[in-house]
Amino acid sequence: MSKKQGARARIPIVMCIDIEPDERVFDPYQPKDWLGFQAGWEPLQHWRTSLSLATGSPAHFNWFVRIDPQIEYSYGAADWAITRYHPCFAAMLRAGDEIGLHPHAWRWREPERRWVSDFGDQAWIEHCVQQGFTHFERRFNRPCRSFRFGDRWLNNQTVTLLERLGAKFDLTIEPGRKREELSESFTGVLPDYTGAQRHPYRPAAADFLQRGDWSSRRDLWHIPISTASPLWDCSLLSRIRVARARFELGHSPRTVVW
């Protein structure tokens, strides 16, 4: 971006907040309020004010709510959170925030009395996604535009479904994450994101991890989230902090989304 008449380059920042239960696995017959979300709500509103004052621009947050079979089975309604925290969602809408979906693939197995992330069953995955979009549109009177699948899980079939359902932005991909196992029970495999793109892109229809050309790309955008290894050398982190501080002296973000 060129600088004219003292104008400075502006850096948009997208920051995601997942609205979900405190525990990944819990007793579905004794569901609890989501205390983490409750505790973070007011501080984030103070942050909104501070960020707006610091940048001279409105700060809009990006919220991704759990609407999926685990919530339905445990709380009696897949969209329970929107009812339970209705004042918060009303405030998000008034503030012009983005609200999207963050479903997980948990399935309750009663004989074993345990939750299983059933990534290996594509029909179940599509049920989780479809359920979320259906309830979202009913509650907000519009299609869901933004999406983040739980546990960074994604595949081409699901991206095709997201596009068909009207999603415009997917924020699932975590670049650098290797194919690994969860600590809880699951089926299937998690994606390998070691070679994933780190900048927003429209994916190729045949491979959601590849940038598509003009003739084969999807309408949907992938926005990979920022990732870093906790094993980075401290001296490297120090150099990054210094470089960032120098950079920020001449740049300020226009819009901040948490």
What do these predicted ranges mean?
Residues 10-16, 60, 96, 144, ...:
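Extracellular structured ligand-interaction cores
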Residues 2-91, 95:
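Active-site beta->alpha N-cap acidic-glycine motif
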Residues 23-35, 117, 241-256:
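A solvent-exposed, charged loop/short amphipathic helix patch at secondary-structure junctions
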Residues 25-28, 72-77, 110-112, 156-161, ...:
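A short acidic (Asp/Glu
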Residues 38-49, 86, 90, 126, ...:
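Amphipathic, non-transmembrane alpha-helical secondary structure
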